A protein has these predicted regions:
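Hinge/lid segment of periplasmic solute-binding proteins
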Residues: 83-134, 257-261
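C-terminal capping/gating helix-and-loop segments adjacent to ligand/active sites or protein-protein/ligand interfaces
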Residues: 316, 333-388
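Glycine-centered hinge/linker elements that transmit conformational signals in sensory
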Residues: 193-222
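Extracytoplasmic/periplasmic solute-binding protein
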Residues: 124-128, 134, 152-196, 202, ...
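Extracytoplasmic "Venus flytrap"/periplasmic binding protein-like
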Residues: 42, 46-109, 146, 236-237
């Protein structure tokens, strides 16, 4: 009698009485190893009808694409990656399309995370987190919640208090917030080259705001070490992400606070600063010998329960909408600020490698208060360089 089964067909014994062992390798970040091992053990326990051999290796989300491309056949069957790598991974034929349980995966995760895990409308990954973004940390003994809604107000109050407002403007990741807030866009043309519109009228207005900010006596730039060392002392507010939450809380104590990025002022009015929003995603290697089981494992590792566990263990913002709505998430000051900023965010998926160096150079010029070249020319030069294909 024929009967249906939810079990993957690959679970069927290869020969009568001798089930095939399903061998899978998983890559994850160093800090996730213990947590991932627990999740893998739970997956094996939940699927006792299969003989499993699942091993775990250390490759961070940031390094996943590079490591995969070194030797695709030797890469893990299931691996975590930052979603700004997804176009390159898909173009390299690295990822299996998500063909099992896709509708459920789309329904349970935020729209942004699904878009960030898809290419040309096709889902290629399993969203894990929505935590790769930035927002504003501030000292509540210097600023009120209302103050930090306006960059102008913040700078005025910081100057009164003899304090600094920190932002790494010579970093392309952060400087984009001004352009994105005022309608700037990233796109990829038919030839696979970067297209940006940061030198139009809105881009010039954003650049004027960057110039005014970097010229203000209260402005301070630098890397994370400058922010961490100065917060609560010389620095009263700074733009950063969740990775610095512990250091910020330790520095500020009872004055620890965070919010979305502020608005800046243009001739046309106030503009809410944008940001980049990135997602951590699980992918299944297109060369895996066990695609169905690899998909089931990726599905399990990224489900609601395990996203809650990720938050509890690592304070990583879930992409799962139910997990993200947990009271503990809203009570986490840094995570709540990130959630407040994320609606103004733009996926990094459309950002190519040609963007970063020209944007950094533009920011560095304004940080140095070098006004020898007018802003429009600086913008035109930056955009031309960004849109020049790599290797040209």
């Amino acid at each position: 009698v024929a009967c249906s089964s939810d079990k993957p067909s690959g679970d069927a014994p290869a020969t009568e009485g001798a089930a095939e062992t399903v061998t899978l390798r998983v890559w994850g970040a160093q800090d996730d190893q213990e947590m991932l091992q627990g999740m893998i053990d739970a997956f094996i326990a939940a699927n006792p009808d299969t003989e499993w051999d699942i091993t775990l290796g250390v490759v961070s989300e940031a390094d996943a694409k590079t490591k995969y491309l070194e030797d695709p056949a030797a890469a893990a069957d299931v691996f975590a990656f930052a979603n700004d790598q997804i176009i390159d991974l898909v173009n390299a034929g690295a990822l299996y399309k998500v063909t099992r349980n896709a509708d459920d995966i789309k329904a349970r995760n935020s729209e942004g995370s699904i878009e960030g895990s898809s290419v040309d409308g096709q889902l290629y990954g399993y969203p894990l987190t929505a935590d790769n973004g930035y927002f504003l940390y501030y000292d509540s003994s210097v600023f009120t919640k209302e103050d930090v809604d306006s960059l102008d107000t913040m700078l005025a109050k910081a100057n009164e208090a003899g304090k600094k407002v920190f932002m790494d403007v010579s970093n392309g990741w952060y400087i984009a917030s001004f352009f994105l807030g005022n309608g700037g866009t990233f796109a990829i043309d038919a030839d696979g080259n970067q297209v940006v519109d940061f030198n139009n009228e809105n881009g010039l207005a954003a650049a004027e705001a960057i110039k005014a900010f970097t010229a203000d006596p209260a402005f301070l730039t630098g890397d994370d070490s400058i922010l961490v060392a100065g917060m609560g002392d010389t620095i009263a507010a700074g733009v950063s992400g969740t990775w610095n939450a512990t250091a910020m809380e330790e520095a500020l104590g009872e004055n620890y606070a965070a919010a979305k990025l502020p608005k800046y002022t243009t001739a046309a009015g106030e503009v809410q600063m944008g940001s980049f929003v990135g997602y951590k995603v699980l992918g299944v290697n297109s060369q895996t010998k066990f695609p169905e089981q690899a998909m089931d494992l990726a599905d399990f590792l990224s489900n609601e329960e395990n996203q809650k566990l990720r938050f509890e263990t690592r304070q990583l913002l879930p992409s799962n909408t139910v997990a993200a709505a947990e009271p503990a998430v809203a009570e986490n000051i840094a995570i709540a600020a990130l959630q407040e900023q994320n609606p103004y965010g733009t996926s990094q998926k459309e950002v190519l490698g040609t963007y970063w160096a020209p944007a950094e150079a533009f920011g560095a010029t304004l940080e140095a208060k070098d006004y020898s070249i007018d802003l429009q020319t600086l913008l035109d030069d930056m955009v031309e360089q960004i849109q020049t294909p790599a290797g040209n």
